């Protein structure tokens, strides 16, 4: 299973319609588009998927639709994390039922939980996942939970934990984790340092911009396998030029707008309170979509 979890995993966006409801047809197209890019898997229902502005029923529906489109074709990881252990367990059970390959959960947030409470939270989810491996999700910038290296080392050695999504930007810590846990599947979480993350010991990555240019990240992996660091650096620079623009537009809404221009997503809106893309960025996003479509062709 560890080998199946390695690679380039797109953190899947969740399309909505003009009424802010789940757009299941756009979601199906997006899953197929990602498969067509040659990515290794999908990370479903995470930060990029706007999970925390969805109901539990909606999150289950997303898991079901993605499984219908992609089960058996690529690796599927269900992010089931919520601030509630019981709700996370419910989503983990759904992931097992729909045939996902693994579950993942962000550290419980908002309340100042003790570290032992964090551990108990993960143990309960792992139990409900009924044999599916757990990917611990460390993203201190959004969760507000700043785990120490010792705490990370403890979490990744809990029975049932097979992987870590490390979205901290700390490459030294990435290398320390790899050194301490040579068999752990380790994902780089920040797209803009993907190549550096691989050099620091990551097995692959989980990222939002893979939705529109997954082949570039696969190219970075291949270049490093071949020892061509200069090529990997060039590809990372091209990815980062895109990320520069998306930071200005707002990453999720910018990605949806690009996918709208690619005829993948019908409505380029995130769920409120996220606002639409500022119209001044639309020409640049349309040009980017055209460039990427030509590059992919």
From Swiss-Prot:
Q: Name one GO biological process term.
A: carbohydrate metabolic process
> Where the protein is mainly located, per its record?
cytoplasm
Alphabetically list the UniProt keywords.
Answer: Carbohydrate metabolism, Cytoplasm, Lyase, Schiff base
According to the UniProt record, which cysteines are disulfide-bonded?
A: none
Q: Where is the active site?
A: 137, 165
Record's Pfam families? Answer: DHDPS
CDD domains associated with the record: NAL
Cell location:
Cytoplasm
Q: What would you give as a GO molecular function for this chain, any one?
A: N-acetylneuraminate lyase activity
Q: Where is the signal peptide?
A: none
> What reaction does this enzyme carry out catalytically?
aceneuramate = aldehydo-N-acetyl-D-mannosamine + pyruvate
Query: What does the UniProt function comment say about this protein?
Result: Catalyzes the reversible aldol cleavage of N-acetylneuraminic acid (sialic acid; Neu5Ac) to form pyruvate and N-acetylmannosamine (ManNAc) via a Schiff base intermediate.
Q: Which NCBIfam families match?
A: nanA, PRK04147.1
Similarity remark: Belongs to the DapA family. NanA subfamily.
Give the protein's recorded name.
N-acetylneuraminate lyase
Per the UniProt record, the source organism is Salmonella paratyphi A (strain AKU_12601)
